[in-house]
């Protein structure tokens, strides 16, 4: 899973 999306941002 994309942990950066968990953090609340994903470009």
Curated annotation (Swiss-Prot):
UniProt note on tissues of expression: Expressed in placenta, specifically the maternal caruncula tissue (MCT) and the fetal cotyledonary tissue (FCT) (at protein level).
Keyword presence, Protease: no
Main location: secreted
Family: Belongs to the fetuin family.
Key words, A-Z: Secreted
Protein name: Alpha-2-HS-glycoprotein
Superkingdom of origin: Eukaryota
Subcellular location as annotated: Secreted
Organism per entry: Dama dama (Fallow deer)
GO cellular component, as recorded: extracellular region
